[in-house]
A protein has these predicted regions:
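Short sequence/structural segments immediately N-terminal
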Residues: 1-125
């Protein structure tokens, strides 16, 4: 989402900070734990960050699943998608996702960041 063919650039807060006031404040409080990790050496080197990448990603995926991928939906909305303009496989997947009540993060993990080492994750995560 940072570099793409359309030139529209999503920055960190677009995906990681809710727009509504109360959810935004809750997210900022939770982010203090991440700041603590950086300051006190838990994730202060690339190696330590990589060692914690899966846990951090799973926490973020859970947050996005719990809020129905709201930050994605600020820009992307099933209701306004023209699936006829999409590649056939994407259209089928989006139509099925709507029927199954899925949210963006169910299929689009790794859309903006490289995925962590997924060997410890059970298939179909």
């Amino acid at each position: 989402h940072y570099n793409n063919r359309s030139g529209v650039r999503a920055t960190c807060p677009d995906c990681h900070v809710p727009h509504e006031f109360v959810p935004k404040m809750i997210r900022k409080l939770k982010a203090s734990k991440e700041l603590y990790g950086k300051i006190f050496g838990v994730i202060d080197t690339p190696q330590k960050f990589e060692a914690h990448r899966l846990t951090m990603a799973q926490n973020e995926w859970r947050r996005m699943k719990d809020n129905n991928s709201q930050e994605c939906r600020n820009c992307h909305n099933f209701e306004y998608m023209d699936t006829t303009a999409q590649k056939s496989v994407a259209a089928k997947m989006h139509d099925q996702a709507v029927k199954d009540g899925q949210t963006c993060i169910d299929c689009h993990k790794g859309i903006a960041h490289k995925l962590p080492d997924m060997r410890e994750v059970e298939p179909g995560f």
